[in-house]
From Swiss-Prot:
Represses a number of genes involved in the response to DNA damage (SOS response), including recA and lexA. In the presence of single-stranded DNA, RecA interacts with LexA causing an autocatalytic cleavage which disrupts the DNA-binding part of LexA, leading to derepression of the SOS regulon and eventually DNA repair. It is an enzyme of class 3 (hydrolase). The active site is at S145 (for autocatalytic cleavage activity), K183 (for autocatalytic cleavage activity). This is LexA repressor. Homodimer. The gene is lexA. Keywords: Autocatalytic cleavage, DNA damage, DNA repair, DNA replication, DNA-binding, Hydrolase, Repressor, SOS response, Transcription, Transcription regulation. It comes from Rhizorhabdus wittichii (strain DSM 6014 / CCUG 31198 / JCM 15750 / NBRC 105917 / EY 4224 / RW1). The record marks A111, G112 as: Cleavage. It catalyses: Hydrolysis of Ala-|-Gly bond in repressor LexA. GO terms for molecular function: DNA binding; serine-type endopeptidase activity. Residues 26-46 bind DNA. Its EC number is 3.4.21.88.
Length: 224
């Protein structure tokens, strides 16, 4: 039973250890969680230690070990976020608990409406373990253009707000300030290419000033 900040810090530490094998610095943790001082990081780490989620390794600087993650962490759909197909997605939770967070649900990805214009329509209950650090929102997927990435019509795409992306990441792209779409992001020379995950659809190419990134896919939920 973690607070949102405790959960964000635990996910940040775990992700950094998986990526680099080295714990993040207190300064990095402070910036990632948008805290005003390192004392806030110390308090969060102490709370995670008391709950046996992490431990500090003795006689080693910047040495933290993640002992366990919240139970719902096993459902994290990292393959979909990295662009690899998945046969199934975690189901939408039906009952609220302390490991479930409410994030804005902006409706279906719709032509003619930038994401900002869809603010505050409703909310979606999401297992906290699916959300790492950062600000998130959800979109209901419309259509079958991403089926080969395991993203089906009616799924809920969990989006981490971002303005930039690396090649191969799945993003919400706003095209010409008019049409929002969920696609693979790639740079191709002086152009931006948005790739579907369905052979029935063709890639679309745009000038960089025609495409604005509004977030990156962080996870997926499915209602059964």
């Amino acid at each position: 039973m973690l607070t949102r900040k405790q959960h964000e810090l635990l996910c940040f530490i775990n992700d950094r250890l998986l990526q680099t094998g080295v714990s993040p610095s207190f300064e990095e943790m402070k910036e990632a969680l948008d805290l005003k001082s390192k004392s806030g990081v110390h308090r969060l780490i102490s709370a995670l230690e008391e709950r046996n989620f992490i431990r500090r390794l003795p006689n080693r600087a910047r040495a933290l070990e993640v002992l366990r993650m919240p139970e719902t962490a096993t459902a994290k759909p990292t393959a979909a976020a990295s662009g690899k197909a998945k046969a199934a997605a975690p189901a939408v939770p039906q009952a609220a608990n302390e490991n479930v967070l409410e994030i804005p649900l902006h409706g279906r990805i719709a032509a003619g409406l930038p994401i900002e214009a869809l603010e505050g329509q409703s909310s979606l209950s999401v297992p906290a373990a699916l959300l790492g650090p950062g600000e998130h929102y959800a979109l209901e997927v419309a259509g079958d253009s991403m089926v080969e990435a395991g993203i089906l019509d009616g799924d809920y795409a969990l989006i981490r707000r971002a303005e930039t992306a690396r090649d191969g990441e799945i993003v919400v792209a706003l095209i010409a300030d008019a049409e929002a779409t969920l696609k693979y992001f790639r740079r191709e020379g002086a152009m931006i290419r948005l790739d579907p995950a369905n052979r029935a659809y063709d890639p679309q190419r745009y000038k960089p000033d025609q495409v604005r990134i509004q977030g990156k896919l962080a996870g997926l939920l499915r209602r059964y």
